[in-house]
Design a protein with these regions (language model features):
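Conserved P-loop
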Residues: 154-189
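N-terminal accessory targeting/assembly segments
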Residues: 1-87, 91-92, 96
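The Walker A (P-loop) glycine that initiates the GxxxxGKT/S ATP-binding motif of P-loop NTPases
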Residues: 150-151
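Small-side-chain structural scaffolding
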Residues: 15, 23, 41, 51, ...
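P-loop NTPase nucleotide-binding/switch module
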Residues: 67-70, 76, 83, 93-145, ...
Length: 189
């Protein structure tokens, strides 16, 4: 990919790079700070030859003069493998559970393509959570998301753990399925 030296400005988690050519929206960018520290970002806006880049790991230690910016030429991708089941990942898809990296050649764009609702199969697989308020009032269907919003100090983490542990297909099927749990602001207990 194309590499640039220096930044035009740094403002919180955003940096501006001028003189950019052949960049695209949502392109992943790699920063090298002081010749060694690596950080990752994503282009969130393009205007003429300027790119606004969101830095995922913060802009600490980044300088206007000594930061190298490399355009990767691809959007954010996540590695996929059966070994992902039971693992813990950070927000950019890197394992944080101490079990090492995923070994796979399969990567997918996290942005995906929009689904045509007319061509989508009608959802039929009920998910039993074992929590009567959810099962009776806000029934979950396979493939659906269940947001859990909670105030500080409430047992939202215990509720989420209970759902993940008890979830099963409601029709009594032994067909395997996975629960994908994503969270912000919870402890890794």
């Amino acid at each position: 990919g194309i590499e640039y030296l220096g930044l035009s400005s740094i403002n919180g988690p955003l940096v501006i790079l001028e003189g950019v050519q052949d960049a695209f929206f949502d392109e992943i960018v790699e920063f090298t700070v002081d010749g060694k520290t690596k950080k990752i970002g994503r282009i969130i806006e393009l205007y003429e030859d300027k790119a606004v880049i969101q830095v995922f790991e913060g802009t600490e230690n980044m300088s206007l003069d000594n930061t190298r910016t490399k355009l990767t030429g691809h959007p954010m991708e996540v590695s996929l493998a059966p070994d992902m089941l039971g693992r813990t990942f950070n927000g950019i898809g890197k394992p944080i559970d101490g079990l090492g990296p995923l070994i796979t050649d399969v990567k997918r764009d996290v942005n995906g393509l929009p689904l045509n609702p007319v061509r989508r199969k009608y959802p039929r697989n009920y998910i039993r959570t074992g929590i009567s308020a959810i099962d009776g009032l806000t029934t979950l269907i396979r493939g659906q998301k269940l947001p859990i919003f909670s105030g500080n100090g409430l047992p939202h983490d215990q509720l989420a753990a209970q759902i993940v542990k008890q979830a099963s297909l409601g029709d009594g099927s032994d067909e395997p399925f996975a629960v994908v749990f994503g969270a912000m602001g919870v402890k890794h207990d």
